[in-house]
Amino acid sequence: MQIKSPYYRVSVKAKINFNGKILLVKEDGKKWDLPGGGIEHYETIDEALKRELTEEIGVSDFILTSGPKNFKMIDAAANRPLIFIAYELELDSATEFHPSGNVEIGLFDPGKIQDTVSYSPEYSDYIRE
C-alpha cells in the first residue's frame, strides 16, 4: 500500500468504563470507536481530550485513571498513518451524556465488542481489556 503522506495525524482517545460498560461513539454513521479526535497545533493533550469529549459526548468533567497508551496504525480508508494517545477515564455514575447531533453513543459489554471495533488487533484488544 502506498502511503499518501509520511506525516502522522495525532489523536487523543478516551477509554471510558461507565458502569461496567465501554463507551463507544459512532460519528456520521461511520464505525464505532473510542471518543476523541485530532490534537490541534495550539493544544496540549489534556486540552484536546477535554475539547473532544465536550464536543462528542457533552462531558467535560472526568478523572484520568491511567494512560497514556500509544497506538500507531494505518487508516486504510484515508490511506494515512495515525497515532492515537489513549487514556482511561472514570465518570460519575450519574453522568448524563449530551452527544452532538452527528454522534451516536453506545455502551458495550467489554467481552462482546470484539467485532464492533475494526482497527488493529492491539487497539481492539486494548478497548476490550
Regions found by a protein language model. Give the residues of each.
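Acidic, metal-coordinating catalytic segment for phosphate/diphosphate chemistry
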Residues: M1-K13, N19
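Active-site beta-strand termini and strand-to-loop segments that position acidic
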Residues: I16-N19, L89-L91
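Unchanged
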Residues: I39-I63, F71-E122
